[in-house]
Swiss-Prot record:
Keywords: Cell cycle, Cell division, Cell inner membrane, Cell membrane, Cell shape, Cell wall biogenesis/degradation, Magnesium, Membrane, Metal-binding, Peptidoglycan synthesis, Transferase, Transmembrane, Transmembrane helix. It is a multi-pass membrane protein. This is Phospho-N-acetylmuramoyl-pentapeptide-transferase. The keyword RNA-binding does not apply. One of its GO terms (biological process) is cell wall organization. It comes from Christiangramia forsetii (strain DSM 17595 / CGMCC 1.15422 / KT0803). The lineage of its organism: Bacteria, Pseudomonadati, Bacteroidota, Flavobacteriia, Flavobacteriales. Catalyzes the initial step of the lipid cycle reactions in the biosynthesis of the cell wall peptidoglycan: transfers peptidoglycan precursor phospho-MurNAc-pentapeptide from UDP-MurNAc-pentapeptide onto the lipid carrier undecaprenyl phosphate, yielding undecaprenyl-pyrophosphoryl-MurNAc-pentapeptide, known as lipid I. The gene is mraY. Its main location: membrane.
Length: 410
């Protein structure tokens, strides 16, 4: 909203300094500063409110050291992340941008599902929370919205061959590129570490009959649904010990922010020989606000946690990361960039699958890990949770660097 206000003041009254709001870098900086302020300053007030209303975590005894001490810790802290993200976005982003709209919808959609789950657990005293089938339906619903928007919306395009305009203006991330050239409506994505790294989803169906290329949405939309569901569940499983989900997600989000910025900049996309995605640079405002909210939330969520994000936060985080990866055409990089989420997910799948298999074969269930998800396995081995979290963050940073390298190494 401030963007439109200062744009008006610049055009009508030539207000000194109003032109700053034309620059993506300035608005991104303001977004992260404001989100950090909201999440740290007002986050404390929200935590006190949650504590006063006795909205606390009910902890099941899983035999983990220090677990029972966490009983009663305020939960639903994901609302801090959501509020600290949306306020800067509404103030500094271009609200007509389709990518910004999609991310706002994702935040509210997944936040509502997570909030309902936490509400049932906390107020209805049902430890299972929202039934799993309803969570999955909600995730599928979001995936359907994202998939249809990405495929059918006319403003979501790519451009492989760029035409250089004003190098100085673009390098400093001026808000808009004047001459973008022809835009292409397609379902192209990028394959990491491959020289000719562009992949068209329509090729999965067009080989049967070239005329089927118009039905590529039959392939593309289900893939988007799968990605949204998988990543949101991965983030949800990762939120098991203090600071793990928020810290790991901040690393992932900042990396995706870099991808969004270079993909939305005509000069850098040309220099790096990557796909230019018109209008995607505006996502940087959302990403910086979201990253600031996560870091601010960590102020209270690191060991010993003063608040838990609950499903309100974890499902929202996973949904946003999935949509960011899809929007920047980096969804095939998710197994690398979101490697922490992946191993947490796989540890649960392997544990459950092996237990069921051995029970059928030997009459008793056997386990691969002492406990799943993987972070609980290390807790069972006697590792302190703060050490586990920091080591997972280090792995996350390594995976983020590896992901960034794909911009140039093919």
């Amino acid at each position: 909203m401030l963007y439109y206000l200062f744009k008006f003041l610049e055009e009508q009254y030539q207000l000194p300094g109003a032109q700053l709001f034309d620059f993506l870098s300035f608005r991104s900086a303001m977004a992260i500063i404001l989100s950090l302020g909201i999440s740290t300053i007002y986050g404390k007030r929200i935590i006190n409110y949650l504590r006063a209303k006795q909205i606390g975590e009910s902890v099941r005894d899983l035999g983990l050291k220090g677990q029972t001490e966490k009983a009663g810790t305020p939960t639903m802290g994901g609302v801090i992340i959501i509020i600290a993200t949306l306020i800067p976005v509404l103030l500094f982003a271009k609200l007509e941008n389709i990518y910004v709209i999609l991310l706002i919808v994702t935040t509210l959609w997944m936040g509502a599902i997570g909030f309902l789950d936490d509400y049932i657990k906390t107020f209805k005293k049902d430890k299972e929370g929202l039934k799993g089938i309803f969570k999955v339906i909600g995730q599928i619903g979001l995936g359907l919205i994202v998939g249809c928007t990405m495929y059918f919306h006319p403003q979501i395009t790519t451009k492989e061959v760029v035409t250089e305009t004003n190098p100085t203006e673009n390098v400093i991330a001026r808000a808009e590129v004047v001459d973008m050239g022809p835009e292409v409506k397609d379902t192209t994505t990028t394959i990491p570490f491959v020289k000719n790294n562009e992949f068209e989803y329509s090729s999965l169906i067009s080989w049967i009959n070239p005329s089927l290329v118009n039905y590529a949405w039959l392939i593309f939309i289900p893939i988007v649904i799968f990605i949204v569901t998988a990543v949101s569940n991965g983030a949800n499983l990762t939120d098991g010990i203090d600071g793990l989900a928020a810290g790991s997600s901040a690393i992932i989000v900042l990396t995706l922010g870099l991808f969004a910025w270079v993909s939305g900049n005509i000069i850098f996309s040309d220099y790096l020989n990557i796909m230019y995605i018109p209008r995607s640079g505006e996502m940087t405002i959302f990403i910086t606000a979201f990253a600031g909210a996560l870091v601010g939330f960590l102020w209270y969520n690191t060991y010993p946690a003063q608040v838990f994000m609950g499903d309100t936060g974890s499902l929202t985080i996973g949904g946003i990361i999935a949509v960011l990866a899809i929007a920047t055409r980096k969804e095939l990089l998710i197994p690398v960039l979101c490697g922490i989420f992946l191993i947490e997910n796989l540890s649960v799948v392997m544990q459950v699958g092996w237990f069921k298999f051995t029970r059928m074969k030997y009459g008793e269930g056997r386990r691969i890990f002492l406990m799943s998800p993987l972070h609980h396995h290390y807790q069972k081995k006697g590792k302190h949770e703060s050490k586990i979290v920091v080591r997972f963050w280090i792995i996350g940073i390594f995976l983020a660097i590896l992901s960034i390298i794909t911009l140039k190494v093919r």
